[in-house]
Amino acid sequence: MELKNIVNSYNITNILGYLRRSRQDMEREKRTGEDTLTEQKELMNKILTAIEIPYELKMEIGSGESIDGRPVFKECLKDLEEGKYQAIAVKEITRLSRGSYSDAGQIVNLLQSKRLIIITPYKVYDPRNPVDMRQIRFELFMAREEFEMTRERMTGAKYTYAAQGKWISGLAPYGYQLNKKTSKLDPVEDEAKVVQLIFNIFLNGLNGKDYSYTAIASHLTNLQIPTPSGKKRWNQYTIKAILQNEVYIGTVKYKVREKTKDGKRTIRPEKEQIVVQDAHAPIIDKEQFQQSQVKIANKVPLLPNKDEFELSELAGVCTCSKCGEPLSKYESKRIRKNKDGTESVYHVKSLTCKKNKCTYVRYNDVENAILDYLSSLNDLNDSTLTKHINSMLSKYEDDNSNMKTKKQMSEHLSQKEKELKNKENFIFDKYESGIYSDELFLKRKAALDEEFKELQNAKNELNGLQDTQSEIDSNTVRNNINKIIDQYHIESSSEKKNELLRMVLKDVIVNMTQKRKGPIPAQFEITPILRFNFIFDLTATNSFH
């Protein structure tokens, strides 16, 4: 009996097709460059189209070991549990699971409880048939055993190669290339010189000035040296990663971290790590590397220098009232005709909403309006100042009413932190298994670090919100305002001025009330929102004295 007739003999109205690469598929892709997932999709489309029952294909791009590591399959199980499909189609039964026996048990229980038919290109399995059920259990069991044996062989080989100083961590790091005969790293002369330059600038600076990671990145970009991934612009994360990588002193490390049962990543005991010194030719001498690590450990933020991009005074401070987008500085060059017929060039600075173009106001006017606002607070009497701040705090609570309660906000942030830690574990797994290159890992890690930073800022704001019942000390507010304004006028660095404004202001909402008309500039209103710590903390501005 052909496949179509067998399937149609069951009461099936919808079929779910699940596509996933096997380990053999991955190895074939590496050898031949073929796209096995597309090949699998074409096969299943051909099989299921011939059956003439509505179906949907879901494709797992990754290949996780457990159900939790396969988000698409996890979603499939939920759909099957809810009865959206009466059958699941796979290239072979082993595509369903190679995870733990508990995973296999979960799948078997679902197949039996929902009486789900399994469709493969060659056979249909009915969980109500004892013979079919025995075959399903056997194949899932053998898939796990085969996976364990393969992993043991691969792990054993990796340990052996690593102990011999061979490179087994994916792509060769910047400055080296993999010697296919020895499986060890050989220096690439041009890239090695760049690595040496990075260490030299970090330790000794340039032209008598100390250089931060960002300044070094800007310097390499200005020299038009391609990044490890071939891009034009270097970033601070790549610089720091190079400075901390022991591979440049000839050391190879393997199995440094491990994942605990609760999902956290910890450093393995030293006796369990594989560390091979002098595994390949070093690019940096050990003394220079050690000096760099000491400097990194004791590093303090550096002031910007001429090679380093400097933030403007209002960077990240102002928001458009109409669309909620951040406002950015825009500087244009204009030509003015003089009465004597000559021309003169002048520059115009504006603050604009680049995305939606709904706000366009003079930059200096907004800066002055913010400073005037801060000065005006100092002129208010105690009662009016307290009333103004309480009104602002109430508005902040209203703006965050979608969270409804502080408890819900706290729970939301805790859940977000858990999600970020899971992401962190994921990218470390991919990096250590060689799936992520150094550049891709650094890019993902940098993005994740930014999310962690935003999360911490949100926690700080929530803590401030929870403390708003504290009595507002008008003297504290005035003292902090005076320090900020005085220091602002002293500073010549726009970036330091930006730090001062961001210390006191959580946001400044700019509302353009009238567009520019000829020589008459655009009219606007500002709604500043003070930071909680600035209002209540006596030491908020101490770092500037």
UniProtKB/Swiss-Prot annotation:
Descriptive protein name: Resolvase homolog YokA
One BP term from GO: DNA recombination
Entries under InterPro entries matching the protein: DNA_bind_recomb_sf (IPR038109), DNA_bind_recombinase_dom (IPR011109), Resolv_N (IPR006119), Resolvase-like_N_sf (IPR036162), SSR_resolvase (IPR050639)
One Pfam family hit: Resolvase
Disulfide bonds: none
CDD domains named among the record's database cross-references: Ser_Recombinase
GO molecular function: DNA binding; DNA strand exchange activity
Residues of the active site: S22
Family: In the N-terminal section; belongs to the site-specific recombinase resolvase family.
Annotation: DNA-binding region: 173-303
Coiled-coil features, chain-numbered ranges: 19-46, 402-475
This protein's UniProt keywords: Coiled coil, DNA integration, DNA recombination, DNA-binding
Keyword Coiled coil assigned: yes
Domain Resolvase/invertase-type recombinase catalytic: 14-165
Record has DNA-binding as a keyword: yes
Superkingdom in the source lineage: Bacteria
